[in-house]
């Protein structure tokens, strides 16, 4: 089951500062070698700049909560080959949050920024900062986790089917894998 962790800060001087610090973190967290990395940010409309993220933080209406969300597929059951489309999974997760908020009668859209972290741990994950009006209770978080897990498992099945078809086609066509460098070195 995918892990979806959340925490929130209320809009205000301190909350806005923490939200902006979170944007800097998700964009620049050091990689495995402790090197500073510049990760591309994205939101529901596609690529997003850090200044655009800061702007939606500054423009957040009264009553806004800034949710920090971490989306982490299960590496043994869902992201076995580290090949899931994490942006698509993020879109599904955020769409679920939008549906929950809309069901509360809130018409203010959920605005968010995210970055994929696939370079400092063996577990691919996404960090999201979302500007949310309304509430997310435990049943809501369970629903978000279930929708995210379902999206991960559906992608895993599709990817595994594609890999299986590719292997069958290669076998049928008499394809053999390229020798490894060790095999080349020994003349095998």
Predicted regions and their residues:
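N-terminal nicking endonuclease/strand-transfer module with a His-rich metal-binding environment
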Residues: 1-125, 129-188
